[in-house]
Amino acid sequence: MKKNNSPASLFGLKGLALAVLATAFGITSCKSDFDLDKRTPEWLGTSIFETMVNGFEGNEGQHYQFNTFVELIRALDKESNSTYESVLSRTGSKTLFIADDDAFKRFFADCPFKTASGEPARSIEELSHAQKLMILNGSMLNNVYQVAMLSSTPNPSGSGAPVTGNCMRRVSAASVYDSIPIIMPEDMPSNSEIWRGYKSKFPNGMVCFSDGTRRSMIFFVDKFLTSHKITDDDYDFLFNQGEGTGRPGRKPGEASINGVKIEYKDKKCFNGFIHVMSDVIYLLPSMAEYLEQDTENAYIYSHILDRFSCPVYSEGVQKEVLSRMEIPSTAETTQKVFVRQYFSLRSQGNAEFGKIPNSNDKPFKDNALLKFDPGWNEYYAESGSTEANIALQQNMGVMFVPTDATIKKWWLESPAGTSLRKRYGIAKYRNSAPVTYKEVAEDMDSIPEKVIVKLINNNMQGSLVNTVPSKFPNVLNDAQDPLFEGISDPETCFDSIVMCCNGAVYYTNTVFTPTAYRSVSYPALVNEYLQIINAAIEDVTLQFSAYLNSMQVTYSFFIPTAQSSDPNLNGKLVWLDPSSFAHRKNNPGQDYLEAMVFRYNTEKSKVEAEVCKYDPQTNKLLEVPTAATTVSDDVIQNRMRDILDYHIIIGNVEGSDVADADGYAYFPTKGRGTIRFKMGASAEDLDQMEVDGGYQIENANTANIKISVLERHDQTSDHGNGVTYIIDKPLLTSSKSVYDVLSDSAEYPEFYEFFNLMNNASGSDGKPIFVNKSNGNDIASKFNVGSFNTYHYTVYVPTNESIKALIDSGKIADPDKLTEFNDYWEGIKSDLADDPEGDLIWIDSMLDLSKRLTGVADSSFNYKAYYNRKRDELKNFVKYHIQDNSVIANAKFEAGYKDDGSPATIANYETAYMKTVGKNQQFVKLKVEGGKDIKITDVKGNTRNVLKQTGSKGHSLYNILCREYEFKVGTSAGDITDVSTAMIETSSYAVIHLIDGPLCNGEVDF
């Protein structure tokens, strides 16, 4: 790591023109306001001020003189009629971290404070009033602290001993109102629409505080460092010292303030303590302030941050300012007082600042919020105490800031930078690349906030304590993956560190590009016609952003565009809503379905939707969208989750080695549905690519159903995580349930016999396989499979011939015969109930019935037990053909791994059939071998094969995709009467295959 050996680099300030913090924008000082205790207990010794005047002996015989510090205090009192000397001479509670005269000589020899002419200040006289205050109040605490107690915080219980090793910051004696900053129009950010409005509104300048909250001093003592596992090497890294820097590293036992060593500690005075510092300390700026003024290294980065800031009128701050002094006449005569804030998830008061002031709660652009407000002086980490004052003391933030030279190189040469430049770079630099840093910043101005915020946020860390070199392996990026993965020595990425009052700026010589720029989600981020999907990805509740940004997984991501040649639909995404299947079912005369029509409202930065009628024959809307907002945010969020779950595939869909003869291969989606994909002759032949959802497959003969692949983006070319396909319409899941397919004897006569068993398999408990409600919720079809439970399944259907043979052999009962015999038995019971000769006739009837059913005449035959046993056997037989896990032919078979780490080729899957073993019940399994073909082995060792055939009506008899839904009406159970209020509560996916023979579960042997 490169180091800077300037004395000011103790603070990491590197000779920055700190005059800006004290004199720029016409800063004017305020009068002080103290409530003095005039009592002076003589037995406690001299006061702080008298001790400074007299000086004192150090531990090693050196004599400390503080004439310069005394001169500074008296100059302040003289300039503003303040009472600092009096305050420090009377009883009170103060702690001062002061520099002696020798330290001030070094300070003025290389002074970071500049005069009005831009020259370094060389004496107290040349310092402005505000600069003097920065030194005095920046080195003072309004309480009494010995060094041993600097790391202590109050006990969270409100009583008991303080918690030691818990504090690294305390609010200094500086007041927000020590100076009044006035910002002139020419100094307002030029790349912000909001600021441009204020330029014209306040031509004479406006009073605008950089934050409006108090600044802290930074403490590092042994107890804190050891408690938080921060090593001496970590400390040296933070303060640009140690090996290779020419400055000695930290020694055990040392304590420092703002990185400056305490040379002599705990000088007791009657009104507090004095600690002698090895160098002058002063009030530190916030990270945002520092970057704004470091035009040599951070011009571009600060220029980007400007776009996320705005002035916020503060009535409270204005009242406080006016109570102390008049606003200078150079400022706007309206005397409005503003505070600068940054649009962020966490700003002042730990509250989100995401609405543009005076805009009727209009969200900031696309809700592009920073992780935290870099100008928030009282920033504290989310993981800290629930009490803000304690949380502030425990931690602060970090910003990784690439230097201007680094950003320029990234913008002009890196894959991510050049991609952004190609898309967003301005015309004037199209043929001639920007040269100066100002030109680079200008060239980057057109990047939308929602895009550039990814870069900023990836380089913001919420905890300094957890972002030191010894903990670099645990620092994460925007995808929650290790940020420094693949970097052998992360420290080499940093040039220098700057300590600020609310965090540390780590200057980097590399750009930590957000994974969002390499992710399959990137096209959605930068394409205006994909804003609907991008908004769903960014939804913090849905949590797709981190999922899609993971670089540990390869994805194929299909994104439907909202671009359309139809002006009524351009910018809208039409999605056939599955709840409309239930709505149509509940209204038998209804011949249309309904679609959600989504659009992105740029003013509100949100997705809106309305419901329109949809023709399932033409696959077009039957009415023109009106832009009405008829669907709640909760329902939209519910649908967006469903859409994304079906458009994300884990793995590469191209070049499958299990595709069928026509080139089709099947792939599971994130939500465990299935899509079908056909590759073109090459990756560039988009017109030859085909992709279908379940609905597209089952309605292949209807108009306008085919999906076109419009674009292909290979994100792996920049070490990304997959391929993105832009498609012209959404993939749709199947509308059919297992019941819909199996019961359709006209289209699927090959399934008739098994359906007859399934439909009549109610067992002795009387609970059928098919149910017309699911957990009291409405369903999309007439019936669902009752055992399905938010998972994915396979239903194996033996051929009609094999079912008939099994029934003919007597292995399982014919349900029609069972019903016939049961009706006969019930009739006998009814007829003989009052017959005096009934017992004899009953015996004869039982002899006849037992002979017909078992082949043996038995007068004691227990028909009811026989009937129930056969019913259970029938139901268990059917349930054994319903398997957990969807297994698709012509799809990669994911069976896990063997003990030796090699891929398994066979998997054992549970079925819906459960048997009793001892006192327990367990699901009976099937052994399955998948891939291009599927083989199933039952518990008796019978091997069956999925028949890859086409039925007599032209339908495939394998890989039949189904989906079974549950819908709520809002949050309640009930029938769907309005698609706009229906919620997809849950669903299950299933695939149906015809197999060449029945599966034996062991209960009946065959």
Locate predicted features.
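Sec-dependent bacterial lipoprotein signal peptides
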Residues: M1-C30
